[in-house]
Every structure is written in C-alpha cells, then in structure tokens.
Amino acid sequence: MDSLRLISKSIKIEGTPFGSSHQRNQIFLKSVAFFLLIGLAYRFLITNSTVSPVPTVRSSPESLPPDPSGLTAITQTSASVDSPANITTIASQNVSTKCDIFIGNWVPDPSGPIYTNVSCRHIQDYQNCLKNGRPDVNYLRWRWQPRDCDLPRFNPEQFLDNMRNKWLAFIGDSISRNHVQSLLCILSQVEEVEDIFHDKEYKSRIWRFPSYNFTLSVIWSPFLVKAETFENGVPFSDIRVHLDKLDQKWTDQYINFDYVVISGGKWFLKTTIFHENNTVTGCHYCQGKNNMTELGYLYSYRKVLHLVLDFVAEPNHKAQVLFRTTTPDHFENGEWDSGGFCNRTMPFTEGSEGEMKSEDVSMRDIELEEFYKTTTTQQEGSNSNIVLLDTTSMSLLRPDGHPGPYRYPNPFAGLKNKELNQVQNDCLHWCLPGPIDSWNDLMVEVMLNRERQRRE
C-alpha cells in the first residue's frame, strides 16, 4: 500500500476545484490519470502476492484394494499460505488424502538404530550378527520411507506411556519372536523389563514394564491351531494339524489382551497331516503315504486363517488385532538345507529388484483375501477390530538384513575355500538391530490410526 500512497501524493490538484474551464479540464485529465494509475498498481500488487497452487499428492498405482477398516491412513494437509512446501502431518484432523505406508523404499539413515547389540540383552545369539562377526554395518543405516508421506520414528517413551495398564501379545512362530525381541530392545532403552513367565523352551514368554504396568508377551503357536509334533516325548515324522481346533495356548489367554499381533508363516510348508472332526482328511507333501489325499499347504493355510480371523472378529472380544502378512525369505541358489545363501549388503529398490517366491505370493494372496472377507463382513454390523500390518513389501526389499552365515560366531573360521559353501545360512530371520526394527514404526502408526478412527 506504500506504493499507492506515493502515487496519490504525486498527483496534487492546485487552486479551486471548480474554477476556470481550463482548470476544470486539467482536473478532469488528472483525475482520469489518477484512477488509471491506481488500477494498474492494484493489479500489479495482487498479481505478485498470489500463492501458487499446492502440488497434487501422487496416488499409489500399486496400492491395495480399499481397506474397509481404513488401516493404512496417514493423513496429509495442504500447505498453508506461510508454508514453503506441502507439509505431511501425522495424526492431522484435516484429512485430504490417504497414504499407503506399506509401499515405499529404504532410504539412508546415518543416525542408525535406537539400540545396539551391547545395549540390549534380549537378542538371541543366532540373530546377534555383529557379535558373531558380520564384517559390514551398512545394513544398520537405513529407514523405511513410504512413497507419499513421512513416517515418524518409533518413540519408545511415548509408546510406553500410551500402553500404560495395557497388554500386547504376539502370536505366531519364530518371526513373531524375532519381532517382539526387536520391540523389547527398543523399549528397554527407556526401562528394563521384568521377566514374568517362560515355558520350558523359552518360546512363550511374558514380560512386564513395572513403571507403566505394561505387559508384553509372545506365544509360540506356529500353526495357530492345535498341532501335534510329539507323542510320549518322541517327535512325529509328520506334524498332525487340526484345522478346526484353535490352539488353546493363545485362545485361553485371549480375554486378557488389549492388542494382538498375529501371523501365520513358513511352518505351513512343512510335511503335515490334516485332521478335521478328528478324522484325517488329507495332507501336504505326504508323498503318497498311507494313500492320503494331497491337499497342499494352501488348503490348510486358508482354512486356518479363516478360523482365526472369525474368532478374533467376534464382537465380545475387546482386543485390537494387527494381522501381519507373510515374511519372504532371501535364499539364493538353494534353500536353507541345500546350500542356499544370502550375502547381499544393500537393499533392493522398489519395482526394480527382488521377486517373491511363488509360495510366498500364494500365501500373501490368501492372507489378503481372508482379511478383506472378514473385515468387510464384520463392518456390516459394526466397526472392525482387525487391521492389516503389511510388512511383506518392505521386507522383500531387504535381502541384506539376515544373519546369513553369521547365525553362529565366526562361521568361516578354519574352513578351506571348498568348504565355505557348506556353512548353513539363515535368510529368513533378521539381524538385531536390523530391518525388522522398522516394523515397529508401522505397527505404532497402524495402532494410532485405529484409535483415531474409533474416536471419530
């Protein structure tokens, strides 16, 4: 407006406004000039003060089908006039778009992990890659970056505060145990846990954070249903799986849980005999034994997931359930028992590297089908208490994050060149610290999103 004042001062009308004709003509011409200059100045100022449009946020062409429970929503807001760029806001109330936090890339993170193999006592020896002599450390310096938004780093103090007087249970196989150990390592940087319970083999355990009255547990249930692997102390050659009976190790405790992370996994690929209504109905990989029908692992996996999801979806159950998807392995040139190895030192990038094995693709397809079937049916009557924790894509991009040969200390010590390929590799579980730590970032965001939706 200072420029308008300067223009106004430069045009002064002298003498009596209605004097002579010559004076009136001068007044008229000066008035016209005055208003023209004001118009031009106004146009100039408005044009140069207009805010540029905020760029449109890209939508993910590879995103999953619409989630009936809204689990992958991270909200984004448009930039304000004072903002230099489009700002991603987690937990915003002004939702303008949804971001699929499960699609993205691993980006360099020089800050590294929250904990180390020295500061955490909960790392099992076969996942303590640095202690076992792994020479590279670059696999520790990456973080997960969703394609269209930012993901907050896990805040252990805030998490413990939010979980005050709560119980979180992990149910599944050794990958679930791997996950809970990662979470323990992060949380123990704030407060060390009390050991409350463990079974004979330390596969099922319960811990407590005393200052927060927060209980954390892991329940060993690799099939999620009743499975018989021993009889009178002698292991079966084939595992007997009851496809219509949930495992009471977790169902008997279920009423206590506030949050549950549950998942299936690789155990369904083992040789198994199927029981339904206490009768043998078929098998997987039974190779013609006793003339049983080969039904395959996909048959059993679908049956079990359907039974599990129906149970946790029952309206009288209070627990909020995070259904975690399958974890791909990264064995190359063989499997765990046939010389397979994983010696990569860098992540893959989205869309350019890394393909899931056919069995992993099939299992993931079944997981998504059964999840959407259950949640869609459930929402017809009420809000779903089940959300998806889709760690498959992000895990596929991390072939560098496994123990590989470093599941034991100094695995190549004393070996000659021709014997190096005889060292057994672990290309399924994850080093601690390692990529699995980022699963907790996703887990927390999914939990927070669900809580926000319940309040709306």
Swiss-Prot record:
So which domain of life are we looking at? Eukaryota
Q: Where does the protein principally reside?
A: membrane
Residue intervals passing through the bilayer: 26-42
Q: Name one GO cellular component term.
A: membrane
For the motif DCXHWCLPGXXDXWN motif, give the residue ranges. 426-440
The entry's keywords = Membrane, Signal-anchor, Transmembrane, Transmembrane helix
| Membrane topology of this protein | Single-pass type II membrane protein
Pfam families xref list = PC-Esterase, PMR5N
Please name every pair of cysteines joined by a disulfide bond in this record.
Answer: none
**Residue span of motif GDS motif:** 172-174
Annotated compartments: Membrane
Q: From the Swiss-Prot or TrEMBL record, what is one GO molecular function term?
A: O-acetyltransferase activity
Question: What is this protein's function?
Answer: May be involved in the O-acetylation of mannan. May act as a bridging protein that binds pectin and other cell wall polysaccharides. Probably involved in maintaining esterification of pectins.
Q: What else is known?
A: Contains 2 motifs that are conserved in esterases, but it is unlikely that this protein belongs to the catalytically active pectin esterases.
**Entry similarity comment:** Belongs to the PC-esterase family. TBL subfamily.
Q: How is this protein named in the record? A: Protein trichome birefringence-like 25
- Gene encoding this chain? TBL25
